[in-house]
């Protein structure tokens, strides 16, 4: 029995050494595994940091190039954008010039028409009549009604007919506010109220005689 106990003690001693060695190995392995894990985890972190550090450098180098490329594009866009405005401004200037020219042209034409119309209104015509019978006196009075001057020459009428015509024309001129003036030996000027005639004194036979009773008319 004593021998068995001694053997058992020895066996247990060796068993405890093996167990302790195994435990030591396990503990060392456990210590190594976290170290390796930490190294493995640290390595990806270092790789990621290195990648991150390398990645921002590329955009920093690319940014000036992109900015340099964007500047000509922006300048070209600005120049292209300015061209339509310049074209629009030129078109506006030409349009305004055409409008001014169009407005000035009608004004000039309207002024010409006004001047022509005023000149036409102020224009006075003188009709020359050679009455041969008493009925021609009515035509002379009709011309006076439309504000026309009439130069009457009685050289183709007899004295009695000429006196009747003068009497009729003189009465019509007073009604129409016209004037009848003798301008020659057998010629008389009939004018409307808006026409004034200044006749110089001439040596006319029987000048002091009344117009309606002048019988000294020359006949051919």
Swiss-Prot record:
Biased composition (Low complexity): 39-79
Sequence segments annotated as region (Disordered): 1-120
Keyword set, alphabetical order: Cell cycle, Cell division, Cytoplasm, Septation
Entry GO CC: cytoplasm
Source lineage: Bacteria, Bacillati, Bacillota, Bacilli, Lactobacillales
Subunit and interaction comment: Homodimer. Interacts with FtsZ.
Localisation per UniProt entry: Cytoplasm
Name of the encoding gene: sepF
Protein name (database record): Cell division protein SepF
Compositional bias segments (type: Basic and acidic residues): 26-35, 93-102
Transmembrane segments: none
Organism of origin: Streptococcus equi subsp. equi (strain 4047)
Claim: Transcription is one of the keywords in the record: no
InterPro entries to which the protein is assigned, alphabetical: Cell_div_SepF, Cell_div_SepF/SepF-rel, SepF-like_sf
Family: Belongs to the SepF family.
Annotated GO biological process: division septum assembly; FtsZ-dependent cytokinesis
Function noted in UniProt: Cell division protein that is part of the divisome complex and is recruited early to the Z-ring. Probably stimulates Z-ring formation, perhaps through the cross-linking of FtsZ protofilaments. Its function overlaps with FtsA.
Pfam families to which the protein is assigned, alphabetical: SepF
């Amino acid at each position: 029995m004593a021998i068995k106990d001694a053997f058992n003690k020895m066996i247990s001693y060796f068993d405890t050494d093996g167990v302790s060695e195994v435990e030591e190995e396990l503990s060392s392995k456990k210590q190594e595994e976290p170290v390796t894990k930490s190294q493995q985890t640290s390595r990806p972190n270092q790789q990621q940091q290195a990648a991150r550090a390398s990645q921002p450098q590329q955009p920093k180098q690319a940014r000036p190039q992109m900015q340099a490329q964007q500047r000509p594009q922006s300048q070209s866009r600005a120049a292209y954008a300015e061209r339509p405005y310049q074209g629009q401004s030129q078109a506006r200037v030409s349009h305004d010039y055409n409008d001014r020219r169009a407005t000035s042209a009608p004004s000039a034409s309207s002024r010409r028409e006004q001047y022509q119309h005023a000149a036409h209104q102020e224009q006075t015509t003188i009709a020359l009549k050679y009455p041969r019978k008493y009925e021609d006196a009515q035509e002379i009075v009709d011309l006076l009604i439309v504000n026309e001057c009439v130069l009457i020459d009685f050289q183709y009428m007899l004295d009695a007919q000429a006196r009747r015509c003068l009497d009729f024309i003189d009465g019509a001129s007073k009604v129409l506010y016209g004037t009848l003036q003798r301008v020659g030996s057998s010629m008389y000027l009939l004018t409307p109220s808006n026409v004034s005639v200044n006749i110089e004194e001439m040596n006319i036979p029987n000048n002091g005689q009344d117009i309606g009773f002048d019988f000294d008319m020359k006949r051919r």
